[in-house]
Amino acid sequence: MKLVSSTYVTPSLIAKHLNEQLEKHEFSGAMVFVSADIEYEVLLPLLSLECPYIGSTVLTAQHGVDNAFSTCVVVIFGKEHEPVVGEMRDIAKISNGTTFAFSTSDPEIADYCKISAFSGGLAADNWAFERMAVFLNGNIIESGTVGLHIKSGNETTFDCGWETIPGTRARVTKS
């Protein structure tokens, strides 16, 4: 397996570059959600983020520390790999096949996981990341702070995993 990037995805790093792309300066954090069914080579240039968001289908950014997730800006990569920007409150307009995750405090997360084609992702109750969860195939797996670790096998397959960093309680991988 070739190591594509061992750099940790940090909310502040993604927010910094998203602010530049959207010409905004109030975003405090971001999350990466992973889907193994989309080739990362196609996704890399979409937002030109200088961080390893390889394999992402959804990237969210929230302004403010304690704002509800309904105020998030959502960037969704559809079948044509074109990014669409909207707000998470418009989630009802998103296809059931969209890879997505809600905050761990969202009461509808269990119902959503049942209807979504969900691979995996990270979610937290707020951008202070006081309570974080890892999702894998619709299941909630509690964890601490995690980083996204990407390995590439060949042109059509790759391994996406969550590599623990100091203070974590779990390690989850998806291949």
Short names for language-model regions:
Residues 1-175:
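Cofactor- and metal-binding active-site motifs of prokaryotic enzymes
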